[in-house]
Structure formats: C-alpha cells, structure tokens
C-alpha cells in the first residue's frame, strides 16, 4: 500500500512520488526505532558529521535510507545534515531536497521523541544555487515525529496539513487539512542553563516571563525544554507558545546552533503556513539566505504575537533591556 492512500488531492501531483518515497522511509524508520535495542544498538556513536557533532547509528541509517529511496526520483540534489556536501541523485531531476534525517538523536537512548525534517526547493543548475537561496522560495517542507503517535506535518504552501500513521495499514491518514498555531499560550521553550550567555533582549524577555504575576506580564508562565526540535514544534502547533534558541557568547554559538537549511527554514515554513511566526529574534527566517550548506542561525518561532513581542524586545533602548523588569511596563500582558 502507498503511504498516502487517502485524499490524493492534498498532495500536489508533481510532489506525489517524492512524498511517497519520504513517507515509506519514515514508516520503516519508525519501525526500526520501535525495535531499537532488540536487533541493534541505535544510540551508539559511530562517527562525527561535518560540524563535529557526534553521529548515532540511527543518524547514519536514516540518512542512507532516505538517500537511497530518493534515487531515481525527481530529486536532483540531496543535502543532508549527515553529508559534508550535497549529492547529485538525478541529473534530470527538477527538485532539491534538504533533510535532517534524524533530529533529536541525543534522545534515542532515553525513549523521547525524535524526528525527520525536510525541505524542498525547485532545483537550479547547481547544488549551490539550489540550496543557498531564500527560505521563502520553498515549495514544500515538513517533519515526521516518531513518538507515541507517528505524525507528519507538511505544507505545500497552502496551509499546514497533519497526517497520522495508522500502524494497522502502515499508511499516513490525513486528519487535519488546516492546522493552526494557537494564538496564545503561557509556555515558552528555552535552555535556561545558558542564561548567562544570552543577548540582553533575550534575558529581558525571559526575566519578564519568570517574574510571573509579580512582573510586567502580570501572569505566570511555564518553561519547557525537550532538546528535540520536532517535539518542540509539535507541541507549539498543538498548544501555542514560543521556542527560542538564540545566538550567545560561547565559541561556536555566535550564530546560534540550529542549521538554517534543513532545520530552521522548513520548520519556519510549516509554522508560518499555520499562522505562526518565525524569526532569528529580529528578522523573518524565510527572508534570509544561508551562506553555506550547514550555516547556522538563531531561531525563534511559535504563536505570532509571542514572536513579535520578542522582536520588540530587540528594539528597546539599551537602558530598558538592562533595567529591572518593573520599568518595562510597555510589555504588560
């Protein structure tokens, strides 16, 4: 059975074959994760990628599976977090696909949610021209989350769709054609252990949230942090709120830590198509062009009002971001 047997009108005809291939591999990856530890150790380190990050066995397995499945498809160029350079799959192909085959792999041994993130552009004459371009030129993007449910969230530029894997039929079932980010929430996601390294506007925003009912926001907030971009995104699509991974003062974090091409751009596309916002803290993510294949960027996304508020903190005069939160009454509520 094909992975998307229902609602054939939901996927553009020119992308149907590629989506079928992505969906088929995602189903196999989900099954492999479910059997992890029985047949093989999926969490064991087996190398490093181009940026020196440790590669788990499942990182490499997933990358190989997606790359092989896309050979002979309309994908001309394939760029992966696990590959130093882009790979040519089909000289006659019309598409360029960037992928994080297994996001959140540090969670494998703790049985927390991991996922796959993908982004599709029209192919240009070269891999560089195909990928080093505006995020707004995406024609499709999405992610698969391997959790208690296996879900795919995907956008083809006309809203965001939600599919759930039916384990009985081993196929993805469309359950929502128009996912929307809830406009309001009292949740924020950030790794608070790095507070001392953040820029002042980010510290000011978090200070005001943590101050709760006694601060300028006048309400209590809850912090979340899952160390899995797909899991954070899935929660925000369900409950609203905001995710922050800012640049900071540590070596190697000056431009943030998340990669633009196959993490931030596709997630921003999915979120904005669902009515949310996505920036680098100040400017829209989809209005940017990466300088190299594995370029990093700060990333803020979630409910549109929350994202806009964080941008406004960057516009405050220096004396206000350094002031006690009681003097930032402009940001009440």
Swiss-Prot record:
InterPro entries: FBPase_C_dom (IPR044015), FBPase_class-1 (IPR000146), FBPase_N (IPR033391), FBPtase (IPR028343), Fructose_bisphosphatase_AS (IPR020548). Substrate binds at residues 103-106, 191. Transmembrane segments: none annotated. GO terms for biological process: fructose 1,6-bisphosphate metabolic process; fructose 6-phosphate metabolic process; fructose metabolic process; gluconeogenesis; reductive pentose-phosphate cycle; sucrose biosynthetic process. It comes from the Bacteria. It comes from Cereibacter sphaeroides (strain ATCC 17023 / DSM 158 / JCM 6121 / CCUG 31486 / LMG 2827 / NBRC 12203 / NCIMB 8253 / ATH 2.4.1.). It is found in: Cytoplasm. Mg(2+) 1 binds at residues 81, 100, 102. Belongs to the FBPase class 1 family. The gene is fbp1. Binds 2 magnesium ions per subunit. Homotetramer. It catalyses: beta-D-fructose 1,6-bisphosphate + H2O = beta-D-fructose 6-phosphate + phosphate. Its cofactor is Mg(2+). Pathway: Carbohydrate biosynthesis; Calvin cycle. Its EC number is 3.1.3.11. CDD domains: FBPase (cd00354). Gene3D superfamilies: 3.40.190.80, Fructose-1,6-Bisphosphatase, subunit A, domain 1. Keywords: Calvin cycle, Carbohydrate metabolism, Cytoplasm, Hydrolase, Magnesium, Metal-binding. This is Fructose-1,6-bisphosphatase class 1 1. GO terms for molecular function: fructose 1,6-bisphosphate 1-phosphatase activity; magnesium ion binding. SUPFAM superfamilies: Carbohydrate phosphatase. GO terms for cellular component: cytosol.
